[in-house]
Curated annotation (Swiss-Prot):
It is found in: Cytoplasm. Gene3D superfamilies: Chorismate lyase-like. GO terms for biological process: pyruvate biosynthetic process; ubiquinone biosynthetic process. GO terms for molecular function: chorismate lyase activity. Pathway: Cofactor biosynthesis; ubiquinone biosynthesis. Removes the pyruvyl group from chorismate, with concomitant aromatization of the ring, to provide 4-hydroxybenzoate (4HB) for the ubiquinone pathway. Its EC number is 4.1.3.40. Its main location: cytoplasm. This is Probable chorismate pyruvate-lyase. Belongs to the UbiC family. The lineage of its organism: Bacteria, Pseudomonadati, Pseudomonadota, Gammaproteobacteria, Pseudomonadales. It catalyses: chorismate = 4-hydroxybenzoate + pyruvate.
Length: 178
């Protein structure tokens, strides 16, 4: 993602509706919330998985040196067969090796379900931004979409999960003041 993403905490925001804030800073499982909103018609569509050089903001979020290599997984979280959320999850190669945690085996499973079902993972603070359009897949690319990220840690392993809320989610949730 371009370096112009400005990640903010809740206390750094102004003029955001309480309804949107509730979605952005909900510390529960987004997968579970989306599944409930979709009345069970939820699925994960993998878009990209593999080793890549991590983006500068990702290296900073994982406390690893700039230019570090890591596993990158990009997916859509669908409700009623519409992409509601674009998610990009990354973990540094140095932390993954020997961790026993293999992101490559997830397939169409939700990473969130895995993280929330393993009590050894601790979630760090949630940060939000207006996600740069250049970091989104072409078919959903738009300016000004809300994104959030947080780091899940288990010992030396950190997994940084970023989620971008797409207009189709807000439509389904009946939220107009985005």
């Amino acid at each position: 993602m371009p370096s112009n993403a400005l990640w903010l905490r809740a206390d750094q925001l102004s003029s955001v509706s309480p309804t949107v804030l509730d979605w952005l800073f909900d510390e529960g499982s987004l997968t579970r919330r989306l599944t409930a909103l979709a009345d069970g018609a939820f699925r994960v569509e993998p878009l990209l998985e593999g080793w890549q050089t991590l983006r500068d903001d990702e290296c900073q979020g994982l406390d690893v040196p700039p230019g570090s290599s890591g596993w990158v997984r990009e997916v859509y979280l669908h409700g009623h067969d519409r992409p509601w959320v674009f998610a990009r999850s990354v973990a540094a190669r140095s932390a993954l090796e020997g961790s026993g945690f293999d992101l490559a085996l997830l397939g169409t499973r939700s990473l969130g379900e895995l993280l929330f079902s393993d009590s050894a993972f601790e979630r760090g603070p949630i940060e939000v931004c207006r996600y740069p359009a250049a970091g989104l897949p072409a078919e959903v690319r738009a300016e000004g979409l809300w994104g959030r990220r947080s780091r899940f840690s288990r010992g030396a392993l950190g997994v940084l999960v970023a989620e971008v809320f797409l207009p189709s989610l807000w439509d389904q949730a009946g939220i107009a003041d985005v």
